Regions:
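N-terminal intrinsically disordered, cationic/polar leader segments
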Residues: 1-61, 65-97
């Protein structure tokens, strides 16, 4: 369960179709005034294209909340398991346009 502002809780429901998740080793991020668009994709060695597997569109406010949650969770992960090594700058894992 997740806590909402004010202390109430919401139940997170994941359908069977989404339960296994989707693998991505690439992300492309674009934005305008009203929204951020994140395309998650898969790069296959030997191919010169990225297959987009999911597109997520978020408001700037929600994206900033996600950024905060990711930052907090990476810090917790690194406390428990050690520092995550950075990949090469401009590599396939994250790309901002």
């Amino acid at each position: 369960m997740e806590n909402r502002e004010g202390g109430s809780q919401i139940k997170i429901v994941v359908s069977d179709q989404l339960a296994l998740g989707t693998y991505a080793n690439f992300a492309s991020i674009v934005h305008n005034f009203a929204e951020f668009i994140i395309d998650f994709g898969r790069i296959v060695p030997g191919r010169d294209e990225v297959q987009v597997v999911s597109r997520v569109v978020m408001t700037p406010v929600h994206l900033k909340q996600l950024l905060r949650a990711l930052t907090e969770n990476v810090a917790i992960y690194e406390r428990n398991f050690g520092e995550i090594a950075d990949g090469p700058q401009g590599g396939p894992v994250a790309r901002t346009m």
